[in-house]
Amino acid sequence: MKVLLANPRGFCAGVDRAIEIVERALKLHGAPVYVRHEVVHNKFVVDGLKAKGAIFVEDIADVPNEQVVIFSAHGVSMAVRKQTQDIDATIYDATCPLVTKVHKEVIRKQKQQHQVILIGHKGHPEVEGTLGQSNEELQLVETIEDVGRLNLSKNTPISYTTQTTLSIDDTKHIVDYLKSKFPTIDAPKKDNICYATQNRQDGVKILMQSSDILLVLGSSNSSNSNRLREIAEKMDIPAYLINDADEIDELWLKDVNTIGVTAGASAPEVLVQEVIHYLCDKGVTKVIEVNGAKENIHFPVPKELR
């Protein structure tokens, strides 16, 4: 058996930055620091930060006054931001800069009196944060059927934007339908699209040309990790989303010659290497790094933590 390793894989710049913010805040202030929602959607990462003194909460009401509070990489609504200010917290914002760009774009379009459509998954924390960026209503669509139910004024400009963990491929069918239904609709700027989401999906497509199965390192609540699994499944290749090597079922490897391995944007490389070690123990004799898009993007932490 052999393993094909996808490139790029694992941490993106936004995840790197978010984790670094929590670690630097702990070093500067000491434990505990409070993090609103999981800073990134990965159990291994979250458990590691908990061990260092981070406390993860879903509701700011669970945070005592005058504490350190960090917003997760997914972003928060204006209401959550105000609630945190009201308890005199020291705030560090780990929102991915690409998510922040979407927030600013939504606010800008609404100031221009546009009706704004958000393509995304209902209930995802990034979507909840984007929906809560202003008092004006955004209309959320998840499917083509949702587009048919939109209640829009014919005399007001229309714009759309997307959840950053959805690639161009993920949203193409909805975008195409929106453009056919509303020919003058404004599209987001190209640089609002998350480079990491698209690159990791493109990497999986390359792997799937030569792989019998795909193993995706990532947590079940990670949107981008689930999309990687779905790409393989749409190509009729068995794919499994796993937290770590312990979750691999040996039956998956029966009669398999080539195993594709990748990791979602919030999964650390150490987990990939543990999987490789496990597979080598099970008979893998060759591990090949497959070429993909090069990434050299870095997002700095807030100046207060430098």
From Swiss-Prot:
Sequence positions that bind dimethylallyl diphosphate: H41, H74, H124, S222, S223, N224, S266
Active site location: E126
Enzyme class per UniProt: oxidoreductase
InterPro entries assigned to the protein according to its UniProt record, in alphabetical order: LytB/IspH
Any one GO biological process: terpenoid biosynthetic process
Organism domain of life: Bacteria
Chain residues that bind isopentenyl diphosphate: H41, H74, H124, S222, S223, N224, S266
Chain positions recorded as (2E)-4-hydroxy-3-methylbut-2-enyl diphosphate binding sites: H41, H74, H124, T164, S222, S223, N224, S266
EC number(s) reported in the record: 1.17.7.4
Catalytic activity: isopentenyl diphosphate + 2 oxidized [2Fe-2S]-[ferredoxin] + H2O = (2E)-4-hydroxy-3-methylbut-2-enyl diphosphate + 2 reduced [2Fe-2S]-[ferredoxin] + 2 H(+); dimethylallyl diphosphate + 2 oxidized [2Fe-2S]-[ferredoxin] + H2O = (2E)-4-hydroxy-3-methylbut-2-enyl diphosphate + 2 reduced [2Fe-2S]-[ferredoxin] + 2 H(+)
The keyword Oxidoreductase is annotated on this UniProt entry: yes
Keyword Manganese: no
HAMAP family, alphabetized: IspH
Function, in words: Catalyzes the conversion of 1-hydroxy-2-methyl-2-(E)-butenyl 4-diphosphate (HMBPP) into a mixture of isopentenyl diphosphate (IPP) and dimethylallyl diphosphate (DMAPP). Acts in the terminal step of the DOXP/MEP pathway for isoprenoid precursor biosynthesis.
Listed name of the protein: 4-hydroxy-3-methylbut-2-enyl diphosphate reductase
Organism: Ruthia magnifica subsp. Calyptogena magnifica
Gene that this polypeptide is encoded by: ispH
